[in-house]
């Protein structure tokens, strides 16, 4: 993928080769819609959603009661970040993020640069 640091780019390439999974919390999709509506990113909803429906290597993770319970133990400022981190923690997943607060928190293992 273009414009990503090497480690993040490599993670996406592993997924493309079928060597790994990427979990996508539903809040991330909601954020994408919001940012597109505000004109901050370019996004084709139909293409994104259809690709996610057929891609076995991208797993959409719903907001569940377990995630909400885990949010209580995530001391970050932004609710959406807390949801994302709580989801990663419950899944035991490495979080691909450039968010400095999340990376500095060491709540979950992160990957970016």
Positions of PLM-derived features:
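Acidic, PIN/NYN-like endoribonuclease modules and their adjacent C-terminal/linker elements
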Residues: 55, 85-113
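Acidic catalytic patch
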Residues: 49-74
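Residue-level detector of anion-binding/catalytic polar loops
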Residues: 21, 59, 94
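Short, well-structured N-terminal submotif of metal-dependent ribonuclease cores
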Residues: 1-24, 37-51, 105, 111-113
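Alpha-helix capping/helix-boundary segments
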Residues: 28-29, 67, 84, 101-102
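Phosphate/NTP-binding elements of NTP-utilizing enzymes
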Residues: 32
